[in-house]
A protein has these predicted regions:
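Conserved small/polar residues in nucleotide/adenosyl-binding loops
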Residues: 156-161
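Active-site entrance/lid segments in N-terminal catalytic domains of soluble metabolic enzymes
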Residues: 1-155
């Protein structure tokens, strides 16, 4: 299957596994990547050393692309953001905040950045900040999102997207 997302991420299918806190660990991330999608390690509130270990274990199980979901409310987010670069991870999704302060570091390291957004305004802000794509997510997701439904967010965000 060939789509803009498969081209961007180097995967077989346009499927990005959620970066679910305490669930999305290296076994799941590697399995999803091996199946042709993009597996994610959910960094959640983990210390940087734990995220580093998860990345290394994922690399032992797959040579396919995978990423890390950085929860920006995590007090360790700045250190986790650096670990992503140090370990050569090429895909980052973000949630629970604005990744703007990490964007330059990630982009200089060749990281594809995909923030999770809950509104058109946030999607446009992320586009201006250099995001490669966004995930439009609503209140059903169980994440740190507002009161808009996913379908509403998706429709408005896709209408507003430059491409």
């Amino acid at each position: 299957m060939k789509t803009r997302i498969t081209d961007l991420l180097g995967c077989q299918y346009p499927v990005i596994q959620g970066g679910m806190a305490w669930v999305a660990e290296y076994h799941l991330a590697a399995a999803v990547s091996e199946a042709g999608g993009i597996g994610l390690i959910g960094a959640a509130s983990a210390p940087p050393e734990v995220v580093r270990e998860q990345i290394r274990k994922t690399k032992e199980l797959t040579d396919k692309p995978f990423g890390v979901n950085v929860m920006l409310l995590n007090p360790n987010a700045p250190e986790v953001a650096k670990v992503v670069v140090e370990e050569g991870v090429k895909i980052v999704t973000t949630g629970a905040g604005n990744p703007g302060k990490f964007m330059e570091m990630w982009k200089q390291a060749g990281v594809t950045v995909i923030p999770v957004v809950a509104s058109v305004a946030m999607a446009k802000m992320m586009e201006r900040a250099g995001a490669d794509a966004v995930v439009a997510e609503g209140m059903e997701s169980g994440g740190h999102i507002g009161s808009q439904t996913t379908m509403t967010c998706l429709l408005y965000t896709s209408d507003a997207a430059d491409d």
